[in-house]
A protein has these predicted regions:
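Structural recognition of the beta-strand scaffold that forms the well-ordered cores
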Residues: 95-105, 131-136, 159-165, 200-205, ...
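Internal alpha/beta domain cores that form substrate/cofactor-binding pockets in large enzymes
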Residues: 97, 126-156, 168-201
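A short, solvent-exposed beta-strand micro-motif common in secreted/extracellular proteins
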Residues: 47-62
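Short, acidic Ser/Thr/Gly-rich low-complexity loop/linker segments typical of extracellular
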Residues: 7-15, 20-21, 27-44
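Extracellular beta-sheet/turn segments enriched in Thr/Pro/Gly and aliphatic residues
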Residues: 69-90
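Active-site segments of SGNH/GDSL-like serine hydrolases
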Residues: 164-170, 191-226
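Catalytic His-Asp segment of secreted/periplasmic serine-dependent ester chemistry enzymes
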Residues: 208-307
Length: 308
C-alpha cells in the first residue's frame, strides 16, 4: 500500500493528489511497518478479514494528522492510507513561503538563490510536489518582517511559512542594550499571524556570524545570537511551532569560517545547512507529537495565540 497526503480530506486519492509520505510508521491489524520511497509499505502476517489501518500519529510530519480506515485483508489492490494537513480553505497545498531577510534572499550563494531552490527540489524528490515562493527582503529586521507578513500571506496563500528572522536585529542599539528587545515577540506574532491565515509556521533559529571577522565583534555577537535562540526555542515550544535548528546545525560543524561568504551571509556550504534544517523540520514530527495531535481542533493546529 501507500500513504498519501489527502489534500481535500475526502479519504480517497484523487487525480491531483500526488504527494506520498516516506519514513512514516503505519499499522494494519496490529502489524506495523514504515513507509519507504513513494510512501510505499508492505506488511506481512496481517490477519485476514476487516482490519483497522492508519499512519502512526507520532511519526507523521509536523502538523499532519491521520485517522483510521477499515480495510479488508487480503486486499485486492493497493491500500491507500490518507494523512491530512489542515490548512485554510483558500490556502494552496504544497506551497511554501520562504520569509526573512537577505539570508532568505540568498545573498552570498553562487546563484544568489540561497537555500530555496535546492529545498524545493529536495521536497519534490521526497514528497512529490513543492513550490517555494521567496519573499525574502534584504536588510530587514524582525519588526519589519512582522509588518509585511500579512500582505505576503494574503498574496501567496501558502500552506507553510519558513520564518528566518533576527540576524539584523543585532544592529538595532536597543537590541544590544536592552536584550532581548523585540525579536522574540515579533517572531511570536509571525507564528500567530501565519496560523491566523490558515498556514503552518516553521521557525528557523538564527545562524551564527563568521568568527573570522575580528574587527566586527563576532564573539559578542555570537553570544547574543546564542542567547536569543534560547528564547526563540522557548517561544516555539510555547506556541507548539516546529523549529528548523539552523543555529545548532552550524555549531555542530568542525569550523564556521568555511561556511560563510562574508561576515553574515552563508556560502553554498552554509546554505546547504539551512536547507537541510528546513527539510527536516518540514518532514519530521513535532516534538511531543502524540500529545500535540491529540488536542487538534477542527480547522487549525492551534488557535492563534494558544499556549500549552
Amino acid at each position: 500500500g501507500f500513504l498519501f497526503y489527502d489534500e481535500n480530506g475526502n479519504g480517497t486519492t484523487d487525480g491531483a493528489e500526488s504527494v506520498r509520505l516516506p519514513s512514516v510508521g503505519v499499522s494494519i491489524g496490529g502489524q506495523t511497518g514504515t513507509t519507504t520511497a513513494g510512501g510505499r509499505f508492505s506488511l506481512a502476517s496481517v490477519p485476514n478479514g476487516a482490519q483497522s489501518a492508519q499512519a502512526r500519529t507520532e511519526t507523521l510530519p509536523a502538523y499532519f494528522t491521520a485517522t483510521g480506515v477499515s480495510v479488508t485483508v487480503p486486499a485486492t489492490g493497493d491500500v491507500a492510507l490518507p494523512a491530512r494537513l489542515v490548512i485554510g480553505s483558500r490556502n494552496r497545498p504544497n506551497v511554501y513561503l520562504a520569509f526573512g531577510d537577505s539570508i532568505t534572499v540568498g545573498e552570498g550563494s553562487t546563484d544568489e538563490e540561497g537555500y530555496v531552490d535546492d529545498l524545493e527540489a529536495q521536497m519534490r524528490t521526497f514528497w512529490g510536489k513543492a513550490d517555494i515562493v521567496n519573499a525574502g527582503q534584504s536588510a530587514t529586521r524582525s519588526d519589519a518582517g512582522r509588518s509585511r507578513l500579512p500582505g505576503e500571506l494574503g498574496r501567496h496563500r501558502p500552506a507553510y511559512v519558513l520564518i528566518l528572522y533576527g540576524t539584523n536585529d543585532y544592529n538595532d542599539p536597543a537590541c544590544r542594550s536592552a536584550f532581548p528587545c523585540f525579536t522574540v515577540e515579533m517572531l511570536r506574532d509571525m507564528v500567530q499571524d501565519t496560523r491566523s491565515a490558515g498556514a503552518h509556521p516553521i521557525v528557523g533559529t538564527i545562524p551564527p556570524v563568521n568568527p573570522q571577522y575580528a574587527d566586527r565583534n563576532p564573539t559578542e555577537r555570537n553570544d547574543w545570537v546564542r542567547r536569543m535562540n534560547d528564547l526563540v526555542r522557548q517561544m516555539a515550544a510555547q506556541e507548539r511551532a516546529q523549529v528548523a535548528e539552523i543555529h545548532g546545525d552550524f555549531m555542530r560543524q568542525a569550523s564556521l569560517p568555511p561556511l560563510f561568504a562574508d561576515f553574515l551571509h552563508p556560502n553554498d556550504a552554509g546554505y546547504q545547512i539551512i536547507q537541510q534544517a528546513f527539510f527536516r523540520a518540514i518532514t519530521q514530527p513535532l516534538p511531543g507529537a502524540a500529545a500535540t495531535f491529540a488536542d487538534l481542533g477542527p480547522t487549525l493546529l492551534l488557535p492563534p495565540g494558544a499556549r500549552p
